[in-house]
Amino acid sequence: MGDYGFGVLVQSNTGNKSAFPVRFHPHLQPPHHHQNATPNPAAFINNNTAANGSSAGSAWLFPAPATHNIQDEILGSEKAKSQQQEQQDPLEKQQLSPSPGQEAGILPETEKAKAEENPGDSSSENSNGKEKLRIESPVLTGFDYQEATGLGTSTQPLTSSASSLTGFSNWSAAIAPSSSTIINEDASFFHQGGVPGASANNGALLFQNFPHHVSPGFGGSFSPQIGPLSQHHPHHPHFQHHHSQHQQQRRSPASPHPPPFTHRSAAFNQLPHLANNLNKPPSPWSSYQSPSPTPSSSWSPGGGGYGGWGASQGRDHRRGLNGGITPLNSISPLKKNFASNHIQLQKYARPSSAFAPKSWMEDSLNRADNIFPFPERPRTFDMHSLESSLIDIMRAENDSIKGRLNYSYPGSDSSLLINARTYGRRRGQSSLFPMEDGFLDDGRGDQPLHSGLGSPHCFTHQNGERVERYSRKVFVGGLPPDIDEDEITASFRRFGPLIVDWPHKAESKSYFPPKGYAFLLFQDESSVQALIDACIEEDGKLYLCVSSPTIKDKPVQIRPWNLSDSDFVMDGSQPLDPRKTIFVGGVPRPLRAVELAMIMDRLYGGVCYAGIDTDPELKYPKGAGRVAFSNQQSYIAAISARFVQLQHGEIDKRVEVKPYVLDDQLCDECQGARCGGKFAPFFCANVTCLQYYCEYCWAAIHSRAGREFHKPLVKEGGDRPRHISFRWN
């Protein structure tokens, strides 16, 4: 028998038929054809489409019954080229305006897979569209030639899907609208026209294939080279979307973004913090700037998390006048990077002049705590983040700067209406906002600032007199065990005259603080502010290095009391009723009014005011507080509990709750008729009474059945409440 080969029958519009051999790629050849494939030159065979949209002919594989030699192959090849040149002009016109039959020839990947398994079925289903055989080309050796489905022509590979080998390819082609010239083997695949001249030159452009996550700047599902081509096909937007779902996104070599390193991807994926940074789009606040920014890459979305603030990109929250000051250290607010807890004093230069005014900008650059990370905030707005948020509340009656600040705190359904000053508690800062500089992130940071803002040495003046902001009593904790009173005095004497005190100092007759802490009683409030300026701030706490005979430069904690932390108004629209106020005993001294108010509001709701009792001379907390409710139900629920667990930060203490007893109330029964108009000495805290009684009315009312076991509450003279220095708006 003679030799058998395979040929392709091509039928054109003129009716001429020519058969010439075709050699298939080993990956794309059916299993039963491997032995019979002849090593002939590769060619691309395009089937023409009739004018009515139906297929004028099909390309089928058939066994050639007659033998042939090399001369027959040469003659057939030249004849095919001449026929293709004659058909080139009408073919280009037909490809520029695809017919509905061509649109219907686009199949999803699942149908392509079925077409590979059943060649006969796929050929019958694609009878309405153009067909092209994907054949090995010597020019494309080493490249996985990938056709752009829906770009220019709607061709369908009959043997294998092109996307099955894209993982091993680094190059792909961007097909121009007219691709019929690819059959010319002597045509070059690299044109000098570039992307803008692709349609004019009728050539193919080769671009590197990159993973979709490497080029986030282009955004969406459109690659760079698809954009120019899409201008020639505005009536087929679904082609590009369909094409982008089944093929990898392409990257132009001219793209400003760096190419990926595929050989490092495995190592990066093993490190979670590095793998996440590779897969996320760059933050608009990052240090890398694209040389040719596009609208889609200028504001690419960042990751989640504090994000709105850019925490994952190492964005520094400290901002200058116009947000353009580069920080000394870009420290993540959610990560600490200290090797030890020891603080070296030589890193921080103390100010030469304690009261020399300087600009807030200079102070922010020279601040000692600029090297330390920001205070750790496990929750965005909890009580720890409100440490210096509400400043000088109810003490700003004559201050010219007042504002209504809306702030939502955890567990609340409405925002807080706070009548507060706009400057911070210390160093001109306030942690009401995540940014420590206290400026709103809405463009208002450029407006003129108050003279008391920004510098730790600038004090607020009222009617020519300086307003006190701190108590003259300061807590000092973590003292060296061998330090005595004289050494403590010598360590803090440079800030001003002071007296060292600690609990039970007179009874103990000891020169050493028994529990490692003491109180500094300064003569002037300005000494406290000078002490604060000399401290080091870390995690929201102040430290100062103190030396003893055996320990040198030991950091001790400095805990001043801000006078604005004594009162907090949560709801200024509600009237303050003493009959709906509770007394909280045993309040830890670090707890502030804002924290006490939020704890009680979370437990019982309806809190409109909270206050910390302070001594009238030094204005330091005495260990008790008051909470006023806006409704009777919350008030009764609080006094019925009798005990409350105060939990905040390092504070976890069980405190007692009682009705707040006043000593200037008349008897609710006789209105002073039986007692001669004297104030009622007794108050019944039982929920069935909740009234003030004189001695006569108490005996008469509580002699009844069921009330004989009620116990009166007596307000002692020493616990007389101080005047509340605020007024309702």
Curated annotation (Swiss-Prot):
Localisation per UniProt entry: Cytoplasm; Cell projection, Dendrite; Cell projection, Dendritic spine; Postsynaptic density
GO biological process: cellular response to amino acid stimulus; cellular response to decreased oxygen levels; cellular response to glucose starvation; ionotropic glutamate receptor signaling pathway; negative regulation of neuron apoptotic process; response to ischemia
Keywords tagged on the record: Cell projection, Cytoplasm, Endoplasmic reticulum, Metal-binding, Phosphoprotein, Repeat, RNA-binding, Synapse, Zinc
Composition-biased stretches (Basic residues): 24-35, 232-249
Annotated site, RNA-binding, chain positions: K473
UniProt-annotated binding residues for Zn(2+) 2: C684, C689, H702, H710
GO CC aspect terms: cytoplasm; dendrite; dendritic spine; endoplasmic reticulum; growth cone; nucleus; perinuclear region of cytoplasm; postsynaptic density
PROSITE patterns listed in its UniProt record: RRM
Top-rank taxon: Eukaryota
Comp. bias regions, Gly residues: 301-311
Induction (UniProt): Up-regulated in granular cells of the dentate gyrus of CA1 and CA3 after kainate-induced seizures. Up-regulated by high-fat-diet and aging-induced endoplasmic reticulum stress. Expression level fluctuation follows the circadian clock amplitude.
Site positions for Important for the positionning of RRM1 relative to RRM2: W561
Major subcellular site: cytoplasm
GO terms of molecular function: metal ion binding; mRNA 3'-UTR binding; RNA binding; translation regulator activity
Positions bound to Zn(2+) 1: C667, C675, C694, C697
UniProt-annotated stretches for the region RNA-binding: 541-543
Region annotated Disordered, chain positions: 20-50, 78-133, 218-324
Keyword Zinc attached: yes
Modified residues (Phosphoserine): S97, S99, S137, S252, S255, S330, S332
Domain-level remarks: The 2 RRM domains and the C-terminal region mediate interaction with CPE-containing RNA. The interdomain linker (564-579) acts as a hinge to fix the relative orientation of the 2 RRMs. The ZZ domain (509-566) coordinates 2 Zn ions and is probably implicated in mediating interactions with other proteins in addition to increasing the affinity of the RRMs for the CPEs. Unlike in CPEB1, a continuous polar interface is formed between the 2 RRMs.
Family: Belongs to the RRM CPEB family.
Subunit structure: Interacts with TOB1.
Record protein name field: Cytoplasmic polyadenylation element-binding protein 4
